[in-house]
Structures are given as C-alpha cells and as structure tokens.
Amino acid sequence: AAGDSTPKIMWTVVASLAPIVALATYFFGPSALLVVAAATAGALVTERALDRRGTLRDGSAAITGILLGLTLPAGLPLWMAFIGGVFGIGIGKLVFGGLGQNVFNPALLGRAFLQASFPVALTTFPAPATGPWWRLRGDNFAWPFASPRALDTVTGATPLGRMKFDHQGTPLLDLVLGTTSGSLGETSGLVILLCGSYLA
C-alpha cells in the first residue's frame, strides 16, 4: 500500500515467497531448503560485512538470497549457492551504492555469475518427487572445486529443454502443479500466480 515503509514492503515480499519455497521443499526434499538457505546466508553475510548503514533488517538482502535460491537446481553444492549470494549482493547491489541504486537485479546477477562459472552444475536438474522425501537430490555437501562424485539421483529435462531437444511438449497440468524438472522456483505455476496476486 502507498506509504508503507521499505522494510514492510520487503518482508511482505519475503512472506509471499514462503509458499513457493515450501512447495519446492515438498517436491525436492531438504535439498531445496538447503540451497535457498545457503544463497540467503551468502547474501545476508555480505550485506552485514560490507554495508555499515544497518540495512540488514530492511529485508532486501533476504529477498535477493531467496530469489537467487529459487533460480537454482536442488542438487547444487551449497558453497556455490553461498557464493552466488555473496556475488549478487557484493557486486550486484553494494558496488552501485545499495538499495535502489543497483543497475541490475542482484539475484539474477548472482545467477548469471554461477551460470558462467559452473554451467554443468547449473543445468543439472533433479526430477521432482523421486525416491524418499528426505534423500538429498544431488551433491549439496560437495567440497569446493572437488571432482563430482557419482550421484544416486534421477535427473530430468526442463519443459523448455524437452521442447528444444526432444520436440515434446509438457502436459499443462504438470506445469500448473509443478511436477516438472527445473529450478526450485519453477514449481507450481498456480501457486506462483497466487503468491503474485497477494502482492498486487
């Protein structure tokens, strides 16, 4: 609403993202929550370390971390998600002077940095709802720059990947419900629309 403070607006956005994170966790298990938490931790730590104006509590860094995490695959090593949050806040936001001064979206800049640096990891998408819920969906706890180990996980093509390479469409119901491979935030289109309407 008009006249709302910046922190109120930011934390309202965080609240609107919570159902999407919860649904990603339902589909991809604890890996989803770990990846979002690591990206958010990287963003918050960087905001706290580099910005001395007490902006950590306004919620903008938390939004950056959560949005970044939702653009990542569930099986991503947590250290990659963390440095994505560091890059997004440090280079995408604070270098330009902080909130409202940035030229690029910090979350997407962090995603672009990770995509350029670790293209294979960023395009390996575990299939949703495969195996026991509590099983990690990838190599979340891999050491930085260690050789990837063989993973007992099922991967799948994203809807766009299926269309491009297999010339197959994705059933509309799968897109609505979120039972497709992809990034954590590519879950249920219906839930995403409902969360967006909450902000309208």
Role assignments for model-derived ranges:
Residues 1-47:
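N-terminal signal-anchor module of multipass membrane proteins
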Residues 1-10, 48-57, 74-76, 177-185:
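Short, amphipathic, aromatic/basic-enriched membrane-interface segments that mark the entry/exit
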Residues 10, 14, 20-28, 33-37, 47-52, 59-63, 68-74, 93-94, ...:
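Hydrophobic alpha-helical transmembrane segments
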Residues 19, 38-49, 64-65, 85-93:
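Central hydrophobic cores of alpha-helical transmembrane segments in multi-pass inner-membrane proteins
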Residues 27-41, 75-84, 180-189:
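Structural signature of hydrophobic alpha-helical transmembrane segments
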Residues 60-138:
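Membrane-interface helix-loop-helix junctions at boundaries between adjacent transmembrane segments
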Residues 106-192:
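Long hydrophobic alpha-helical segments that form multi-pass transmembrane helix bundles
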